Amino acid sequence: MKSGVPLLLSNVSWGVAMSVQAAILGRLGASGIAASSIAQTLFQCTSVIAYATGDAARVMTGMAVGEGDMKKVKSGAKTMQLMFLIIGVLTSLVLFLVRKPIISVYNASVETAEFANIFVLILCVTAIGTAYEMPCLTGIVSGGGDTNFVFFNDIVFMWCIVLPLSALSAFYFKFPPAVTFALLKADQILKCFVAIVKVNRFKWVRVLTR
């Protein structure tokens, strides 16, 4: 129960954060909002495997930890990290290759199409980070039992870094839409540095079963 509460709170926090992000995106103008929708939809379609690996990593790590086999836990974590990076690179490549044909299908204005192309290029970079940090933290670390860290990490990056900087970009400095969009996705890269250190120290292993 104790390990499940942080995950629940993390999901609630994420839901609220999405509403705040929507308000920030609303400052990008009609073309920016439409372009963001196109880019996000395309990203979600190409990153299904990356998100699925997070669930698989959580189950596999939880089973290994439950068995008390630290050798298996460590070798599994290292193998999965390599797999996450490969999936990220492939996802980024697919996203890059299909962006123009897919964007052209939409009945969008020239400005919207240009914004969408820029946003997708930004996502091509962050996709690699997402494919690595997300399954590492919500999969391996969470599956290992350290759900408190995952919750704390999400709170810090989303509410203390990404949303404040994005809000300043959109409302105060009025930076170009691409800058605001990039800031909204910046945590996907920044979290990678945390994930690398956290996962490979193996201090996240918690035996939750008796």
Model-derived segments and spans:
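Helix-terminus/linker motif at the lipid-water interface of multi-pass membrane proteins
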Residues: 12-45, 63-67, 101-110, 172
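Membrane-helix interface segments
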Residues: 31-32, 147-148, 176-177
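Hydrophobic positions within alpha-helical transmembrane segments of bacterial inner-membrane proteins
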Residues: 12, 16, 88-96, 131, ...
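Transmembrane alpha-helix boundary and packing residues in multipass membrane permease domains
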Residues: 7, 11, 19, 23, ...
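Short runs within selected transmembrane alpha-helices of multi-pass transporters and secretion channels
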Residues: 50-54, 123-143, 149-158, 165, ...
